[in-house]
Amino acid sequence: MALSREQMAQRVAREMQDGYYVNLGIGIPTLVANYIPEGMEVMLQSENGLLGMGAFPTEAEVDADMINAGKQTVTARIGASIFSSAESFAMIRGGHIDLTVLGAFEVDVEGNIASWMIPGKLVKGMGGAMDLVAGAENIIVTMTHASKDGESKLLPRCSLPLTGAGCIKRVLTDLAYLEIQDGAFILKERAPGVSVEEIIAKTAGKLIVPDHVPEMQFAAQ
């Protein structure tokens, strides 16, 4: 079956490395903060001006003045820094973020990403995504494999206005973990209980399927 939002966050958290500075985008990416491997030193950055963001707060820990870029209440780790958004974006544009995790509407086989606008619908604005895709070389996109209408979000070419071009190399969906190389998606892992055939059927862009595609593993709850 398809991964839950929490399982997607758990899988992305496995891509963290000790000493990383990581920016988490709005939506599913924010959940990753709850699944950083124990004992690993990772500094989470929020573009509204927080370095050292912690997990989501318990009810007793909620501080309405401590929020992330998505206006969600968060915690701050010991040693965290709070600063202006100008300084925050200087970190991003200067290439000081080791890993960025973003949501998206579409990704294509050339590594293009569309994440900010659907024509005819309310547009909130670009946010920090354009700076992040330009300033970070290591980006993971997390999104559902298909839209609510069943249309694939993994395309030969993005149909929506782009956020960035040729910048995405890894995608985690609720069905699969894929890499992008040489104009194709490469299937690396599949969600537990999801068949390769289902992933093929729901991927519009060119898809390379190895002889063996392992299932993702999750600890029993």
Model-inferred region functions:
Residues 3-7, 58-221:
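Conserved phosphate- and dinucleotide-binding cores of soluble alpha/beta proteins
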Residues 1-77:
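N-terminal active-site beta-alpha-beta segment that forms phosphate/nucleotide-binding
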